[in-house]
Amino acid sequence: MIQTKDIIELTDTYGANNYHPLPIVISKAEGVWVEDPEGNRYMDLLSAYSAVNQGHRHPKIINALIDQANRVTLTSRAFHSDQLGPWYEKVAKLTNKEMVLPMNTGAEAVETAIKTVRRWAYDVKKVEANRAEIIVCEDNFHGRTMGSVSMSSNEEYKRGFGPMLPGIVVIPYGDLEALKAAITPNTAAFILEPIQGEAGINIPPAGYLKEAFEVCKKENVLFVADEIQTGLSRTGKVFACDWDNVTPDMYILGKALGGGVFPISCVAANRDILGVFEPGSHGSTFGGNPLACAVSIAALEVLEEEKLTERSLQLGEKLVGQLKEIDNPMITEVRGKGLFIGIELNEPARPYCEQLKAAGLLCKETHENVIRIAPPLVISEEDLEWAFQKIKAVLS
């Protein structure tokens, strides 16, 4: 049987060097546990950046995949499929929106949002042609495509890829006065993460989302929430915007929408926003394909049936409390909502992630000095306690 070192050697030989993963190969997974080719077991505390909220290979989701794969997998959007309509309805009701536009990856959904708000600005708000502006936040992460990279404040993400998309205005995260000052008659939208994931689980001040939404509403600016990582129960609410009782003008969803089994993403908004499209103005051959829709319907049902939102809230509150009790001056802050938790250190986090791997836990550093803790939401209290004891031992 092929071994870990052989797989890593093949990857390093033939793969573009655009990732720096921990030196582990995952060959099997179930629930919160993964296994390498040698049979070593690890607990997954990353959940594929919150794409595996329902746990690895959830039986209901896998059965939906198999059942649909045995019937039809792809029709393109040239024809209707029997899965797309029911999926539309499910997502529309979940988001309380009138329309949904499906894509495949989170970054594609972000690009779709950019196109939507720009066209809305021209067709509805009557902004002068090619003058629309989008406000974003420092330290955001919306993906790796050109539109997403153009919105980034990280110059390393942009290096060698210019010219960037024009009309992007960057303001500090959580700064209401900066938002007010940045809005002009040409502003189409304010796009933000309700909690910044790649920035180190960066949580805005209490009430900020609500106040920012009200500012946008007053100024006729669309409030767009990128809930690709934070949405679908991860933070102890169905959507992270729910913490401030905000229903944004547009949701951007992905990751856990496919249950960690098949990529699917979307934007959801009302007809006065998504109605700006006509046939041929946007599309995706695989977007909304029947296989993805069947998987996604099952994935959303699992979140509801197993009460994973409530589970995330309960277990997250307990774990954050425990982590805050670890006595080590190296830990500068523990913060989180639900099972979306960051442990900020005053030194690089990578060596500690490597120590946690040796102890049987898979974590990933983010923003250089933050350990991200985001296990599948199906994790048991016993497994979470086991994980905490390992984390405590490494960080003590």
From Swiss-Prot:
Q: Which reaction does it catalyse?
A: a 2-oxocarboxylate + L-ornithine = L-glutamate 5-semialdehyde + an L-alpha-amino acid
Tell me its cofactors: pyridoxal 5'-phosphate
Q: Which InterPro entries match?
A: Aminotrans_3 (IPR005814), Aminotrans_3_PPA_site (IPR049704), Class-III_PLP-dep_AT (IPR050103), Orn_aminotrans (IPR010164), Ornith_aminotrans_bact (IPR034757), PyrdxlP-dep_Trfase (IPR015424), PyrdxlP-dep_Trfase_major (IPR015421), PyrdxlP-dep_Trfase_small (IPR015422)
A single Gene Ontology MF term assigned here is:
identical protein binding
**Recorded GO CC terms:** cytoplasm
> Which keywords has UniProt assigned to this entry?
Amino-acid biosynthesis, Aminotransferase, Cytoplasm, Proline biosynthesis, Pyridoxal phosphate, Transferase
- A Pfam family matched by this chain, by name? Aminotran_3
Biological pathway: Amino-acid biosynthesis; L-proline biosynthesis; L-glutamate 5-semialdehyde from L-ornithine: step 1/1
Top-tier EC class: transferase
Q: Give the range the annotation lists for the signal sequence.
A: none
Q: What biological function has been recorded for the protein in this entry?
A: Catalyzes the interconversion of ornithine to glutamate semialdehyde.
Main localization is: cytoplasm
The family this protein is said to belong to: Belongs to the class-III pyridoxal-phosphate-dependent aminotransferase family. OAT subfamily.
Q: Name one GO biological process term.
A: L-proline biosynthetic process
What species is given as this protein's source?
Bacillus cereus (strain ATCC 14579 / DSM 31 / CCUG 7414 / JCM 2152 / NBRC 15305 / NCIMB 9373 / NCTC 2599 / NRRL B-3711)
**Residues modified as N6-(pyridoxal phosphate)lysine:** 255
| Statement: the UniProt record of this protein carries the keyword Transferase | yes
Q: From the Swiss-Prot or TrEMBL record, give the protein name.
A: Ornithine aminotransferase
Name its cellular compartments. Answer: Cytoplasm
Instruction: Report the EC code(s) recorded for this entry.
Output: 2.6.1.13
